[in-house]
């Protein structure tokens, strides 16, 4: 059954594993996450997967919520998502990672703000 109206999916995640960008998923023995076991998540999840999983819906746009990227370089996730959007058309908007206790938080926020799909942190 296809939904008869367009939907903005306001919370999803994309990731490509194997590059050390997701310490919580790429550990040698990933521990259960606060939301449960991580075993079902131990694979890449990219726009093609998302389109397959949402094929029954009229997705008008989607919002990627930061996926606990390696906090050593939070701008890298925003940059990767913009490259992904340019190549694949998704996500439509990005909520980025920012840790306010960082000494360089002003630079991190300015860096995120430079990306046009950014909508918040």
Question: Regions from the language model: what does each represent?
Answer:
Residues 1-121:
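Helix-coil boundary/capping segments in enzymes
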């Amino acid at each position: 059954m296809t939904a008869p109206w367009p939907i903005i999916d306001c919370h999803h995640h994309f990731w490509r594993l194997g590059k050390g960008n997701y310490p919580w998923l790429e550990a040698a023995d990933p521990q259960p996450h606060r939301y449960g076991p991580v075993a079902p998540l131990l694979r890449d999840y990219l726009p093609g997967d998302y389109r397959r999983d949402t094929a029954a819906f009229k997705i008008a746009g989607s919002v990627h919520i930061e996926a606990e990227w390696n906090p050593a370089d939070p701008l890298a996730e925003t940059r990767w998502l913009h490259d992904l959007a340019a190549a694949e058309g998704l996500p439509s908007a990005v909520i980025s990672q920012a840790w306010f206790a960082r000494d360089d938080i002003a630079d991190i926020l300015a860096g995120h703000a430079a990306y046009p799909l950014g909508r918040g942190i």
